[in-house]
Amino acid sequence: AATGKPIILSTGLSSLSEVADSVAYIEKCNPSYISERKLALLQCTSSYPTPDDDANLDAMLTLKSEFGLPVGYSDHTLGVDAIEIAVALGAEIIEKHFTDTREGQTFRDHHVSLTQDEVQKTLDKMQKIVTLKGDGEKILTNSESDAEHHITFRRGIYIKRDVSVGEILTAED
């Protein structure tokens, strides 16, 4: 924290209270890490490979809510599903191991790592997810307003006269 360089804190093997202690210590050393959001917290399960039911991606939402800092995901699961879900949940940082090949490799990291081709495909998919998520603002989109059908899509059924509860409607109504 003394250097002022951004810190990415992986939270593997940590409870929420331990993360809180770490955040408090960093803030004590240099308050700008919090005020300028130079500290990011990564949800991480330190297990190789991480079983799907231990990934706990929603913990990113807990970290975001609790600390108001950028969050991300340090992935040790097999494949890329967890990364894609993390991005959809709002991860700003993704950490995933990569390797030139998994063939003939015995070290644990290679089994959870992506190859060069997989990295590029995953980056493309992550960008698509971010695009599909949008910015969260509910507005009439350009594709809706530019379309000729926007009026016909807003049609509805209306009654011409007052009716009583339980009255059966007819075509004339």
Label every PLM stretch briefly.
Residues A1-D173:
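Catalytic cores and adjacent flexible loops of soluble metabolic enzymes
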